[in-house]
Amino acid sequence: AVTLTCRRRMDKYELIGTYMPQGDGRLVWVDGPALIAWRTGAVLVINEMTSAPADVWVACNDLLEGDAIVVDRTGEVVPRHPNTRVIFTDNRPLGDGGETDQYLGRNAQDASVLDRCWHIACNFPKTDEQIELIWKKVSHLATGLDTGRARNIVRQVVRFAEEVRENNTRAYDNVSISNRGILRFVSMLFAFAKAPKKPENPVQLALGLTIANGLSAAAATGLQNALTYDHAAILSLVMKA
């Protein structure tokens, strides 16, 4: 796959390509991600699509129809490879330009662009699947810990994250916990569990360092309060001799 993460001041040429200066003073054309995908048949993955202005994607409607890319700066015409596909990812619906405490600077996208897309909502994996996915990522950090104990820490954190996700719109100031957040939280708990001298309140400290301290005061308080439901179980595993 060829990937591009959008930004507020993005323009179409970030997709197509541009001339780049070389050490000898020459300007050399460099293909952008869309042109690479059109040539090679790669999947073009556009992350955080609504961070870009709506007019960028309106200008790309011909690309979304599968038309050839006309590089006006070189005169080249590049037909789309039959295997090329375009995937947009975003944390907000593409037609929603509103902001929350989590996702700022978003732009509602034009109906003509939305009409050229399939729209698929991706949910988190089931509990057991998520536990296994997280364990595969962090198992190497559990060296020196009993495997059963380490897996139980993962299980407790996943269940805590699920509880927050289920209640995030009403109890925790619209905050959710991503899988990246789980990985950081578990990694810190493993480190504390292996430490010969434990810090005071290690579970709350780990949550603050890995997730809560980066949130608004209300959201951080909500997460710390939510942790009290699972705190005893996680703490007993971390502090266990």
Regions found by a protein language model. Give the residues of each.
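Alpha-helical lid/collar subdomain of P-loop NTPases
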Residues: 118, 125-241
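AAA+ P-loop NTPase catalytic core and its hallmark functional loops
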Residues: 1-155, 159
